[in-house]
Every structure is written in C-alpha cells, then in structure tokens.
C-alpha cells in the first residue's frame, strides 16, 4: 500500500519493523530501518507507532538469528529517535502452535523472567521511561529524499529492453545515506 494516499483518513500511522540484523553490511540494515521510520513519520508529519517488533528472532526469514546483546535496545531507540511514540511487540507470549511457535516473544516457551531477552525488553522499558518527554514531539527535517512507492512498483514490474539492475529502493537509500552523512 502507498500509505501517503491514506494519510487524510488515518488517525495514526503505524508499521511493523523486522530488520535483518547481523548480516555482513550491518550499516545498510540500520540505514534502511532509519529510512523506513522517517518515511512513516513523514506520512502525517507527526509521530507514528512502532506496532510490531521482535525482541529476539523471527520465524520467517531464510536464517533466523537471535539478536546480539544490546541490539534490541539500539533498534528500539533508533525507532524513537526517528519519530516513534512506541516500541510494541509481536508477540508477548510465544505461541503454542502453528508457525509462530518459533517466532520470538517477550516471554518464551520457558516462561520465566530470567532470560536475556526478557531482561533486554525490561531495559528498553527503563530507557523509554527516561526519555518519556519525547512522546508526542516531532522534529523538522533539514532535507528531504523523495521515495515514490508507485515508481518503485513500476520499475519492479517493468518488462522491457532492460529488466536487470534496476534498483529503485537502493538508489533512494544511497541518496538518503548521503543526506544523513551530512547531518552527522
């Protein structure tokens, strides 16, 4: 969906964030998540809700890796730094059956509160308490990068003389990286 087309009928913008951390190019994963957060914030020019995140490992990627220590806190604070008013989870308690029984959760099958994942979720909550004055605030961007979802779809679906090496999203990310490089 092109969320911008729904901005006038939405009460709140939310999205589900499941970056593929712990790959060779970690920086690009971080930049992509950052760009997606900024896109969500730009829809209504106000804070959004991070509706779903996973404190440990997902169940549906080619390789499902447990986040390294501290990574969940970093990813959560990244969302807040880019306009999220929340860090919410799918799922609170790990499912008993079906495919999501292998999807990470705040409370795993063991059920205790003495796991690393549970401790790290607690750390996120404590960090958010310390910065609660940021809730509802927004920032004014100094630069803009246009991401046209319909253009992305059109290029992805093109059937013509050149069908390879047309990477719209990667081109937008490259421009986005150049802009954030200037900001830091």
Residue ranges and their predicted role:
Residues 7-11, 15-184:
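Carbohydrate-binding surfaces of carbohydrate-active enzymes
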């Amino acid at each position: 969906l092109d969320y911008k087309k729904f901005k006038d009928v939405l009460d709140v913008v939310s999205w589900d964030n499941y970056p593929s951390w712990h790959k060779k190019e970690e920086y690009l994963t971080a930049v992509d998540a950052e760009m997606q957060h900024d896109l969500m914030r730009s829809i209504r020019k106000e804070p959004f809700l991070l509706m779903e995140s996973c404190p440990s490992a997902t169940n549906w990627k080619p390789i499902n890796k447990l986040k390294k220590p501290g990574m969940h806190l970093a990813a959560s604070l990244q969302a807040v730094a880019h306009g999220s008013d929340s860090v919410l989870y799918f799922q609170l308690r790990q499912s008993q059956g079906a495919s999501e029984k292998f999807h990470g959760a705040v409370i795993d099958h063991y059920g205790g509160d003495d796991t690393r994942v549970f401790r790290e979720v607690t750390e996120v909550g404590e960090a958010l308490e310390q910065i609660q004055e940021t809730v509802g605030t927004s920032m004014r961007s100094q630069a803009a990068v246009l991401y046209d979802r319909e253009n992305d779809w059109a290029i992805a679906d093109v059937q013509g003389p050149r069908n390879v090496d047309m990477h719209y999203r990667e081109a937008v990310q490259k421009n986005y990286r150049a802009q954030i490089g200037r900001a830091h």
